[in-house]
Amino acid sequence: MTDLSQKLILSLFPGIGLLDRAFEEKGFCVVRGPDLLWGGDIRQFHPPYGKFWGIIGGPPCQDFSGLRRCAPTGNGLEMLTEYARCVTEAQPKWWLLENVARVPNCDAPDYVTQRFDINQGWYCDVSRLRHIQFGSKSGRLLNVTGRRVTPNCDPAAVANDDRPFRELCRLQGLPDGFDLPGFLAVEKKRAVGNGVPLQMGRVLAQAVIDVYTSPRHTYQLNFAGQVTEARCGCGCGRPITGKAKYATNEQGDTSTCRKRAERNRKSPRATVWTAHG
């Protein structure tokens, strides 16, 4: 049995640590990197080489959000580049990036990258669509399969939410009595709304555990470090068989992956890429 407490995870852009909390609940030891919320600056941060098993984090998403009401500031792309730089410097076994659906692709050398969407409404009665990018040196892929969204879901908690703080905590899966001492009321709501829902974080943490502790599947890689076996055409990384172009969901159809591939063709994502330092 793998002792997860010996597996150091670096959290970038941790905020108030909701994604960190989910990984800690699953047994990982999480080290928090600098965050603007606490006066830190990732641009001045250089993680040590080879010390971290994995890296998790969600760079600021405002520039890529469909709810944005003003022109992009450029900060979003800069922070994505900083995330990729930290991955390249630290060289973990894997990295996981969480963001909004429109975020550009984030690539780093020597990693096979999987991209997929996940909805909080697959697991509870709150709907929140997010985009995940997972990079692995060994070619391992997370198994997170789309489901039907729970009917009559509550709207997700967001940074500018006007609902009570306690209600936002409930929607994010935080325990009764959770508080942020020293924060103004509006700052508390913004910090909680910006976090990764605990239920979603637990699913992602468990997916990492499953793929690294289950009997190993060896992926065939070519000299460019790319998986050579057939994969879904939408970029989610799931294997396909025969003449299929897209993977099937739990209902046995390919509509989710087909629609994602069509969106990608119509509006290709920009790519943030960092070379070896």
Per-segment meaning from a language model:
Residues N222-G277:
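BZIP DNA-binding basic region
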Residues G201:
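Acidic-aromatic/histidine active-site loop/patch
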Residues A205-R216:
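Short, hydrophobic alpha-helical segments
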